[in-house]
């Protein structure tokens, strides 16, 4: 509903945007991150929680990107320019406010210094994943920001999930997009807390509301709450099976196939998706010496 979203943009700009183009309104933040104690519902550790203004501003920028595209498709030239201009101003403000570049050090006089660490906010996985996923990171810093997200996952969190509802929506596909499908696969197959596999190992047949749903205070602890599934299933179809829609063609009219053959621990995938044109299938298996891949496309589509 383009007119309604337009009103939403105006409302938030009027009431919740600072003169420096930062959105301050946020209620839940990265809801339900794994807490520091198994009995807790919500973490109180500042190191685990992502700045609500970072989340709100990043999502406002994402909406502007979508609205620019929607306006362009409808031929609304003036609107498209308005969204694009505001996006550019907010993107610069976002990086000025949230991007941190810690300079390197050297004892050699005149030595060229490269950034020692580049990250957003307080360097949570969510704080780094959102700018990456929304195209907000300056090109020169993309690899460093992605590296910090991976380092936090592997080193700080020992290969475990640390994101809540917001970060988990983009986590898996963005890791793969940045060349870290192996890290995404580690998260997908981990069966110790906190992880999806841990839920299954404890007998869960649906997704819990909390990563620690088996131990947390029952005051807010649904056993059937799909929100923490995040983008795990889209990642399975888009990246493991490699079934993706061409974003510039409507409804899988053109299909992009690009499976994650590179995952050493994964030897076979069999997936199908019922699109509006019909069934799309990607089925592959491999050995160290052989790869076999079958795909099926519906009539009146290309791939």
Residue positions per predicted region:
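Well-ordered alpha-helical scaffold segments within catalytic/enzyme domains
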Residues: 1, 59-77, 129-140, 169-179, ...
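Hydrophobic alpha-helical scaffolding
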Residues: 50-57, 84, 117-121, 158-161, ...
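Non-catalytic C-terminal accessory modules of carbohydrate-active enzymes
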Residues: 182-303
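Active-site-proximal structural scaffolding
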Residues: 5, 53, 63, 87, ...
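Active-site acid/base region of carbohydrate-active enzymes
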Residues: 1-56, 71-130, 140, 190, ...
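Generic hydrophobic alpha-helical scaffold/packing signal
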Residues: 9, 84, 91, 150, ...
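Extracellular polysaccharide-recognition and catalytic grooves
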Residues: 101, 119-222
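Charged/polar, low-hydrophobicity segments characteristic of intrinsically disordered regions
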Residues: 15-27, 96-107, 112, 160-176, ...
